[in-house]
Amino acid sequence: MHPYFSLAGRIALVTGGSRGIGQMIAQGLLEAGARVFICARDAEACADTATRLSAYGDCQAIPADLSSEAGARRLAQALGELSARLDILVNNAGTSWGAALESYPVSGWEKVMQLNVTSVFSCIQQLLPLLRRSASAENPARVINIGSVAGISAMGEQAYAYGPSKAALHQLSRMLAKELVGEHINVNVIAPGRFPSRMTRHIANDPQALEADSASIPMGRWGRPEEMAALAISLAGTAGAYMTGNVIPIDGGFHL
């Protein structure tokens, strides 16, 4: 592997790493040489995924429910017992909620905002000591937040809280990038369009819906796991050392 993309000796944590985009990124980081911890609320699924991903490198599971500040604190404590530092934090855990406008529940809105925005803030806050231990001017620590093209473009689909939550995450990331750059901690956002995941499987499993959805994307298709992994590796590697405060769409041109 070219040294520009090697993550040998680096320690990474991927939240929501048991499936979907989180699993894609975790596998990519492992293949690039990083030691990777994944966390998810479902302890069994998290452990099963870590076992599968161990075929690519050193992967360990940390069960964690990030729906509260206490959960983020427990995650940081658990990671601190396993590693003295954290080089790469990927905040991927998230959720959505869909319902008609007239019946959209406030409880659903609050759940989406809590997990997609507040929990990311709490995770960064609680993991700052470990990130600071790895940060240097030559090789900054990296925070990679997983936003969405829905935070850039008005996608609708009755997911009224999802787009606003991702737009809020994008802005939070810019603010943190500005604040933490002096401590050699870089904060960037990956804003995916369509990728295979639990959140999009209802479309993927319907051939007509998949065809119509793909037609709305300028490149005419969904993203592939290796494309998501490659972008994360770039941000975690040499290219990401001189980047902070960016929101990077990976959506086949959907945001244009």
Swiss-Prot record:
- Might you give the EC number(s) for this enzyme? 1.1.1.100
* Active-site residues, as the UniProt record annotates them: Y162
Give the residues the record marks as binding NADP(+).
14-38
Q: Does the keyword Ion transport apply?
A: no
Could you name the domain of life of the organism this protein comes from? Bacteria
Task performed by this protein: Required for the synthesis of the beta-hydroxy acid moiety of rhamnolipids.
Annotated substrate binding lies at S148
InterPro entries on file: NAD(P)-bd_dom_sf, SDR_fam, Sec_Metab_Biosynth_SDR
Example GO CC term: the record gives: cytosol
Q: In which pathway does it act?
A: Lipid metabolism; rhamnolipid biosynthesis
**Segments passing through the bilayer:** none
Q: Which reaction does it catalyse?
A: a (3R)-hydroxyacyl-[ACP] + NADP(+) = a 3-oxoacyl-[ACP] + NADPH + H(+)
- Give any GO molecular function from the UniProt entry: cholate 7-alpha-dehydrogenase (NAD+) activity
* Keywords in alphabetical order: NADP, Oxidoreductase
Keyword Transport tagged: no
- Which top EC class is given? oxidoreductase
Q: Which family does it belong to?
A: Belongs to the short-chain dehydrogenases/reductases (SDR) family.
Q: What is this protein called?
A: Rhamnolipids biosynthesis 3-oxoacyl-[acyl-carrier-protein] reductase
Q: Which organism is it from?
A: Pseudomonas aeruginosa (strain ATCC 15692 / DSM 22644 / CIP 104116 / JCM 14847 / LMG 12228 / 1C / PRS 101 / PAO1)
